[in-house]
């Protein structure tokens, strides 16, 4: 099974480096993977960084799985996410931020196992969740800050994030759609460290890039 990880990133090279290293460390390579980065046209720093991935990652093969799409900075980040999603080719689409790191080892195997155990529908239309360390997420809510959709779910819905939401709210909206038709798989064995949101101090002191979003 192939996983398509996609995210937008801008001038956050230390965070992006740590994310990519965490993928390299935790992905089992039993499955296939592609990583698609959305980059702003004026972000020369990140574009140069991506030409030297062999100095960042131990697995040279993973370097060949990383591609980027460059365009003008969008007014609506969700439109950028949808553009990236449309360029993926995997069986499972997984949206991320550049300020997360994977904690769970072999998270791809855990995800496939959950889909096989709980995904009995012939149409394979499913939303798969994940857990993260965000302290500013409402306690007790089942929606994932970083959800996955099967290819069939994404194709049927026609988008990944609703562009009616400029910033916040898209993740909750997506969960509600699939929860309403009982097509949510919890997948809580996949855990991410949301580095810029894992303490209250970080949440109330966003970095320069976050302030511009």
Regions found by a protein language model. Give the residues of each.
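Short beta-strand-to-loop element that shapes/binds the nucleotide-sugar donor at the catalytic cleft/hinge
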Residues: 123-145
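Conserved donor-nucleotide/metal-binding helix-loop-beta segment in metal-dependent transferases, i.e.
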Residues: 105-127
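C-terminal catalytic/acceptor-binding lobe
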Residues: 166-213
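Acidic donor-binding segment of Leloir-type glycosyltransferases
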Residues: 23-70
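Short, well-formed alpha-helical segments that are part of the catalytic scaffolds
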Residues: 12-27
């Amino acid at each position: 099974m192939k996983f398509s990880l996609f995210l937008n990133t801008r001038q956050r090279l230390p965070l992006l480096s740590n994310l990519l290293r965490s993928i390299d460390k935790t992905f089992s390579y039993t499955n296939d993977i592609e990583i698609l980065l959305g980059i702003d046209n004026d972000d020369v720093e990140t574009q140069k960084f991506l030409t030297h991935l062999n100095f960042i990652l131990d697995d040279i093969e993973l370097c060949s799985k990383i591609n980027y799409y460059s365009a003008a900075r969008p007014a609506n980040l969700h439109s950028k996410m949808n553009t990236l999603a449309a360029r993926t080719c995997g069986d499972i689409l997984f949206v991320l931020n550049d300020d997360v790191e994977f904690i769970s080892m072999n998270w791809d195997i855990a995800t496939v196992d959950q889909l096989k155990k709980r995904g009995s529908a012939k149409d394979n239309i499913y939303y798969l969740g994940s857990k993260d360390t965000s302290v500013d997420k409402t306690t007790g809510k089942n929606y994932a800050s970083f959800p996955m959709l099967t290819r069939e779910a994404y194709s049927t819905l026609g988008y990944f994030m609703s562009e009616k939401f400029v910033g916040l709210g898209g993740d909750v909206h997506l969960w509600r759609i699939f929860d309403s038709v009982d097509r949510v798989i919890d997948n809580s064995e996949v855990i991410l460290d949301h580095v810029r949101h894992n303490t209250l101090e970080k949440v109330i002191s966003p970095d320069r890039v976050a302030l511009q979003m």
